[in-house]
Amino acid sequence: MAEIKDEGSAKGYAFPLRNPNVTLNERNFAAFTHRSAAAHPWHDLEIGPEAPTVFNCVVEISKGGKVKYELDKNSGLIKVDRVLYSSIVYPHNYGFIPRTICEDSDPMDVLVLMQEPVLTGSFLRARAIGLMPMIDQGEKDDKIIAVCADDPEFRHYRDIKELPPHRLAEIRRFFEDYKKNENKKVDVEAFLPAQAAIDAIKDSMDLYAAYIKAGLQR
């Protein structure tokens, strides 16, 4: 053993002498990275005991942001997808619900109304208050409309019909316009009540359970 002295104290520390020519094989490296890997926000973060009514969600894009961040499903990191082509910004915090999956093979999207922007990669508790059916370039891409369950200004809302009409118009206009300068068509249909959102989340939870089960059986 080679002894290395800590100059800041009288205490010595002994470390094994290592051969600098030794390299890790793939098996060693895989075991090491598995032990030290960060949690995957889609799979490792629990959705919460009150789901599908109140649930955890991960923020990808902060309120007021123009950068379109999204989850990289392989690594679990948040990547930059693009910068919005227009001058509009996200009206509220936007992210996804862990342990859900939709028909497009992505986790369920959620727009969370609250007072302040939240850092990308943070997670919070949200309450479903409505569903915004949306068609993005011919494909279904519905959004859950939610409020932060721990924000005193918004947590009392239980259904989307309780929101001021201007707030709904703001949300609709953003999603109708945010891809126009990319020559991409987005259609937003009539907002649906809280129960429709709760049912959609429950369906996405069931699809996720089936997705994981199928993966384990391969």
Swiss-Prot record:
It comes from the Eukaryota. Its EC number is 3.6.1.1. Its main location: cytoplasm. GO terms for molecular function: inorganic diphosphate phosphatase activity; magnesium ion binding. Coiled coil: none annotated. GO terms for biological process: cell wall pectin metabolic process; cell wall thickening; phosphate-containing compound metabolic process. It catalyses: diphosphate + H2O = 2 phosphate + H(+). One of its GO terms (cellular component) is cytosol. Mg(2+) 1 binds at D104, D109, D141. Substrate binds at K68, R82, Y94, Y178. This is Soluble inorganic pyrophosphatase 2. The gene is PPA2.
